[in-house]
Amino acid sequence: MTFKGFSKKDFKTMQISGLEARMTGIQNDIQPKFRAVGEELTTYLSAKLGDEMFLHIARHQRRSVNPPDSTWLAICHDKRGYKKHPHFQVGLFDKYLFIWLAFIYENEESLKIANRFLKEKKLLADLPDNFAISPDHTEEKTYPVHDGQLEATLERFRDVKKGEFLVGKIYLPDDNHLSPAKDFIKEAEMVLDELIPLYKAALQ
């Protein structure tokens, strides 16, 4: 498909009742956009990082009853899977679109990564004020990155078995960065540029 940007209809897709109906909406309306956006951003990140990156699109295959509250694409250096590695995400809840650098609970280096971020505070202190963090990729709740929740979120990521840490930027459905396509891609690339130093630090 020709990607024209994200619209309010995409957010409404995440409100459709029922697993089968919502998944049909995701597969027909959102995933083609994810593929188009993801291919561009994967190429961009590969060039920026000097390392081949691979696109993954969430399939939600484990779900049998409840529809997913969010859906996303992921970009990672591992072709076989992304969940145990630091990775970039672009995705949707019904209330906002997110662009994250994500460390989810399957990550095998959470202790090392959290301690590095806690020690090297400048890495996160330099992020723009309009960035956000999340302690759980399955929940909509986010916090401004400089709002006093950062240290506690990193400590939880380090100390709790299913702790997570996501950092990036969120966009409400009426945000003018979401369309047209060229504006969204430009915005996403700017966000990724801010997150790349954190990504590199996490891989050290």
Swiss-Prot record:
Spell out the disulfide connections: none
- Family annotation (Gene3D superfamilies): Protein of unknown function DUF1054
Pfam families documented for this protein: DUF1054
The family note in this entry says: Belongs to the UPF0637 family.
The protein's name in its UniProt record = UPF0637 protein lmo1065
Q: Which organism does this record belong to? A: Listeria monocytogenes serovar 1/2a (strain ATCC BAA-679 / EGD-e)
